[in-house]
């Protein structure tokens, strides 16, 4: 493309190349819209087709996964690994197992991951992978056979200095263990090829908690910069996976009153707030097969909003931790009308672009996921460092490093997002991540 093209011309170019990849196009639009004024002031970043290279993955691997279920029926799923950018290190990003997974979603996640990893300042590139396999309702044997079948193809594309996957939606410690074990068997090599491993074979303490803890560390720093804090605040959390669980736990430690949790069936509202005991019980219920927040609400006699998200509940701080685009314009209007002060993304791009703009126009503090939920991948980087050194750090050391990294990310966002009365954290995160990746790409030439 001509180096003098406009923002809309560039976005149309991306849309034309992949007209059906709406999630990916949305991610590119969100990033480029905030970057464009910076790019116009710094024309060196529009040389050598850098932007065109930045939105094109270095490699996309697509393959079939053939496995046998418990009824002895042959099943066929699709799987992908998007190796988006290795400009600053090996590809790094999770594996997602969910029926909604497609190439557009994985490209969007890999694109976001590239900037998120850059923000951590650790030497990690961006990648993402997954399959349309649904682990819900599957036996442990079926999940194991699927993971092993997937690795018979994927293993050849991974390596400690090439591509290091981790977990994501539908992929927890169990699935990581199955995949890492099969990788070791196929490659005859025990080098670190996954993070999020069990503690018995190279995992890191604090890794399961890291995204949720990091989200709260970043949000607390953002609140403090604007004269507030978690202490005494009403907080709503969506979802109840790892991110939501540990965000609730850490927010309670900081003195917040967390009043919601949710799953695909609906939302539980506890006006008195979670306690350690209540949280432990909800975790226990959700860990059981087919356990839902509705069961928890019934047990404790709490309000249950069937089929609804938590955004209609009046709160000071909202932490969307479920999935992409869960918080739309209508939800944003409800939160703003109810006086929300801050929104921080625990999931990957859970807020639509239009909702994000509404929050910013209303003066609501907004922390984008690439900054606020970077704690998970940051601790994955720390796990890689421990594996490379053949060491295991104490939980306190990992947590302290995580807290420090999240404060550094917050500082970078403020530096590039404006140090005035209210920081534009979306702009700050996008520019800070972009500059690191772009400088590396320029230094390495046209490759």
What is each of the regions a protein language model found here?
Residues 2-27, 222, 336-447:
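Adenosine-phosphate binding glycine-rich loop
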Residues 44-75:
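Structured beta-strand/loop patches that form or line metal/cofactor-binding pockets in enzymes
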Residues 63-124, 128, 132:
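Phosphate-interaction motifs
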Residues 98, 117-231:
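Glycine/serine-rich phosphate-binding loop and adjoining beta1-alpha1 elements at the start
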Residues 162-166, 190-194, 237, 260-263, ...:
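General beta-strand structural signal in soluble alpha/beta enzymes
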Residues 195-198, 203-314:
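Glycine-rich phosphate/diphosphate-binding loop of Rossmann-like nucleotide-binding domains
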Residues 266-366, 371:
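Rossmann-like adenosine-cofactor binding region
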């Amino acid at each position: 493309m001509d180096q003098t093209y406009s923002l809309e011309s560039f976005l149309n170019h991306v849309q034309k190349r992949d007209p059906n990849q709406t999630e990916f196009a949305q991610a590119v639009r969100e990033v480029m819209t905030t970057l464009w004024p910076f790019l116009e002031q710094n024309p060196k970043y529009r040389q050598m087709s850098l932007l065109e290279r930045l939105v094109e993955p270095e490699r996309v691997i697509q393959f079939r996964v053939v496995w046998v279920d418990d009824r002895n029926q042959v099943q066929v799923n699709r799987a992908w690994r998007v190796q988006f950018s290795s400009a600053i290190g090996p590809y790094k990003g999770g594996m997602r197992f969910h029926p909604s997974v497609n190439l557009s979603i994985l490209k969007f996640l890999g694109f976001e991951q590239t900037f998120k990893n850059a923000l951590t300042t650790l030497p990690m590139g961006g990648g993402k992978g997954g399959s349309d396999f649904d682990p819900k309702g599957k036996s442990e044997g079926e999940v194991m056979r699927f993971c092993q079948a997937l690795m018979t193809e994927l293993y050849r594309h991974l390596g400690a200095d090439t591509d290091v996957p981790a977990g994501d939606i539908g992929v927890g410690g169990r699935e990581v263990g199955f995949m890492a074990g099969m990788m070791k068997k196929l490659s005859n090599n025990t080098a670190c090829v996954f993070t999020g491993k069990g503690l018995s074979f190279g995992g890191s303490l604090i890794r399961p908690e890291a995204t949720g803890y990091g989200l709260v560390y970043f949000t607390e720093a953002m609140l403090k910069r604007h004269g507030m804090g978690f202490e005494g605040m009403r907080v709503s959390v969506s979802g109840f996976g790892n991110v939501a669980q540990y965000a609730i736990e850490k927010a309670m430690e900081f003195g917040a009153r967390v009043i919601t949790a949710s799953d695909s069936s609906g939302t539980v509202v506890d006006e008195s707030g979670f306690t350690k005991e209540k949280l432990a019980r909800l975790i226990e219920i959700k860990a059981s097969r087919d356990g839902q927040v509705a069961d928890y609400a019934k047990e404790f006699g709490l309000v249950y909003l069937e089929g609804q998200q938590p955004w209609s509940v009046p709160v000071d701080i909202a932490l969307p931790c479920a999935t992409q685009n869960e918080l739309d314009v209508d939800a944003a209007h409800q939160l703003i009308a109810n006086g929300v002060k801050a929104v921080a993304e625990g999931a990957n791009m859970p807020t639509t672009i239009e909702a994000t703009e509404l929050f910013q126009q209303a003066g609501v503090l907004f922390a984008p996921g690439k900054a606020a939920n970077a704690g998970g991948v940051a601790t994955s980087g720390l796990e890689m460092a421990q594996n490379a050194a053949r060491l295991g750090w104490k939980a306190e050391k990992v947590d302290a490093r995580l807290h420090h990294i999240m404060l550094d990310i917050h500082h970078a966002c403020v530096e590039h997002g404006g140090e005035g009365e209210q920081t534009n954290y979306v702009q700050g995160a996008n520019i800070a991540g972009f500059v690191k990746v772009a400088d590396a790409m320029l230094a390495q030439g046209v490759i």
